[in-house]
Amino acid sequence: TGLGYDYTQFRNAFGSSIDRVDYLGGATFATNENSGKRQGITLGNYCNIDITDTINSSEFYNYAIQDPLYMHEYGHTIDGRKRGFAYLFTVGIPSVISAKNSHNIGRLRPSHSYEPYKRRANRLAAKYFSKNYGVNWFSPYPNSNSPWTIADYYPL
């Protein structure tokens, strides 16, 4: 958690700006809105997320339970709680390397999405958000007219 806090503070001071900070399920979500890209990195209870749009100030809860990126990053928080300090070496560092070397597979996902630790985060998120918020990972992608499901973009 200390490393996640430090990374979030460093990111806000010297990297991309953090436009809002929200809390859900014991995790801190530091969001950079209108960033031009959608990506996230989670260390401990700190989920640092870049999004291409904005979140209405009073609607973070609804936004988070409808945006699979937020749910996926929360899955990493759950995984980190289970793995403790080993998370940094078994998930964190390998994930940074995988993301850097990722390439597209088909129309929906980069190769990074298929890494075991990414899929484990998706499974943990699917279980948590299904149990606590009624989210169905196999329903159509939220806020979209697409037939694709969350699982199509965030494989289990």
PLM features: what roles do these ranges have?
Residues 63-71, 80, 114-118:
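Solvent-exposed, acidic/flexible segments
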Residues 35-40, 47-71:
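Short pre-active-site segment immediately N-terminal to the catalytic Zn-binding motif
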Residues 62, 84-85, 104-108:
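Alpha-helix capping and helix-coil boundary motifs
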Residues 74-93:
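Catalytic Zn2+-binding segment of zinc metalloproteases
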Residues 54-55, 75, 128:
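Short, solvent-exposed loop/turn segments at secondary-structure junctions
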Residues 1-11, 15-17, 26-38, 42-44, ...:
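Metalloprotease/metallohydrolase-associated module, dominated by Zn2+-dependent proteases
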